[in-house]
Amino acid sequence: GSGSAATDKFKAERATADTSPERLAAIAKDALGALNDVILKHGVTYPEYRVFKQWLIDVGEGGEWPLFLDVFIEHSVEEVLARSRKGTMGSIEGPYYIENSPELPSKCTLPMREEDEKITPLVFSGQVTDLDGNGLAGAKVELWHADNDGYYSQFAPHLPEWNLRGTIIADEEGRYEITTIQPAPYQIPTDGPTGQFIEAQNGHPWRPAHLHLIVSAPGKESVTTQLYFKGGEWIDSDVASATKPELILDPKTGDDGKNYVTYNFVLDPA
């Protein structure tokens, strides 16, 4: 299914973690204990157990573990990271980040197709500062988001490379002004076992419209986050459980028909 699109990228990254055997044993014990407690609490039957085993096999064979984990688990890992931060709230990265997107000046327009240009423009501006409010010269704002049909470049063959992606270099005061388009809500892929998982519970596969960002500066802790839109559909029932009140934008429409919004990022020291 289409949910496997992020798997090759994840394999290429070869994730590592400096985790001691003792810590791993403690986590594994608690995780398996919690799962066994659920089985006992709900009286899971052998037919249900066999269906679960087959579903686990299907997720692996379908290449959907990155999709499933990023949608249903990553928000808790991000919540652990957030405990140590004083600056801008983070959110999940999701499966569609591509590093080394083209560098763009502090005032710029994201790469887009002619059909993208017909969508309502969004002018997104702000400043990157430290905890004391000092602008961070040359800070990087990596921005990516789906098109109006819910597709991400590099994960949809019909889109040109780097469509609606860029690494914006802030000016000497840490300021930026980026013109892009107003994104739309979209469904996560539903044609594989992740979709079956959602459908079996009468759930929905929708994510509210959002921007993805990674903001960084020398000597500072980078922040990975998402920004949402006030009043947006699905904002109160995000399938990925990733929305936060502090990350909701409220754009205003200008006389020129464009939507304008400002959001400032505050970075913790590294």
Swiss-Prot record:
Required cofactor(s): Fe(3+)
Entry's cofactor comment: Binds 1 Fe(3+) ion per subunit.
Pfam families from the UniProt entry: Dioxygenase_C (PF00775), Dioxygenase_N (PF04444)
Entry EC no(s): 1.13.11.1
Enzyme class, spelled out: oxidoreductase
Keyword Oxidoreductase in record: yes
InterPro entries the UniProt entry points to: 1_2-CTD_multi_dom, Catechol_dOase_N, Cchol_dOase_actb, Chlorcchol_dOase, Intradiol_dOase_C, Intradiol_dOase_core, Intradiol_RC_Dioxygenase
GO MF annotation list: catechol 1,2-dioxygenase activity; ferric iron binding
Keyword terms of this UniProt record: Aromatic hydrocarbons catabolism, Dioxygenase, Iron, Metal-binding, Oxidoreductase
GO annotation terms (biological process): catabolic process; catechol-containing compound metabolic process
PROSITE patterns hit by this protein: INTRADIOL_DIOXYGENAS
Catalysed transformations (reactions): catechol + O2 = cis,cis-muconate + 2 H(+)
Matching SUPFAM superfamilies: Aromatic compound dioxygenase
Binding site for Fe cation: Y152, Y186, H210, H212
Entry similarity comment: Belongs to the intradiol ring-cleavage dioxygenase family.
The protein's name: Catechol 1,2-dioxygenase
Species name: Rhodococcus opacus (Nocardia opaca)
Lineage: Bacteria, Bacillati, Actinomycetota, Actinomycetes, Mycobacteriales
